């Protein structure tokens, strides 16, 4: 798939099981992207709504998820201004890492407001966090906001420190950093599985 990142559906299921309240039923994803989390949530009967800036991604995901037990819906919108219509019991998102991937619509171009087309990291961060602000407003009390994120590097090879800024952002808004999960994909730890590959001369 051209090295595009794909969210692991098993990780989606684990996150739902760990962080959805016992009687929770609604999930909001402010940066929708691919179908995986919505499909898993809908399969288990949860209500899932996502803000997604690309019409082609919305159409593809909505077609895949139209017959699930729970409604899963991607809405063409800008996350920095979109407000969910109902309170939610879990916010999950896996937003873009700055300047790592390209997100295009039907016309082969990034839609206006697409995060990775924003010229500076600071503008990217502020737009990303504006989307988080809207999601926090929709989140019920004593519920989790789960972000799967990573860092990227500037032209000098230095980290932007986006992960650290995430933690400060949420703490400044009264949320608590409850847990950190390091996610290792099997593809990148394959060498450790095959004993002979570790025998060097």
Predicted region positions:
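Mobile active-site "lid"/loop adjacent to the S-adenosyl-L-methionine
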Residues: 88-134, 153-156, 160
């Amino acid at each position: 798939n051209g090295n595009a990142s794909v969210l692991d559906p098993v990780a989606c299921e684990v996150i739902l099981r760990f962080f959805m309240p016992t009687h929770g039923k609604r999930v909001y994803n402010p940066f929708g992207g691919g179908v995986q989390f919505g499909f898993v949530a809908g399969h288990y009967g949860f209500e899932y709504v996502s803000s997604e800036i690309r019409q082609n991604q919305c159409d593809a995901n909505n077609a895949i998820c139209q017959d699930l037990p729970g409604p899963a819906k991607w809405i063409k919108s800008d996350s920095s201004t979109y407000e969910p219509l109902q309170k939610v019991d879990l916010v999950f998102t896996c937003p873009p890492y700055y300047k790592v991937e390209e997100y295009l619509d039907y016309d082969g171009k990034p839609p206006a407001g697409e995060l990775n087309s924003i010229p500076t990291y600071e503008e990217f961060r502020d737009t990303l966090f504006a989307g988080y602000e809207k999601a926090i407003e929709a989140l019920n009390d004593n519920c989790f906001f789960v972000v799967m994120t990573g860092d990227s590097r500037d032209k000098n090879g230095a980290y932007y420190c986006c992960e650290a800024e995430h933690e400060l952002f949420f703490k400044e808004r009264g949320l608590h950093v409850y847990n950190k999960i390091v996610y290792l994909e099997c593809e990148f730890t394959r060498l450790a599985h095959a004993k002979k590959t570790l025998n060097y001369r």
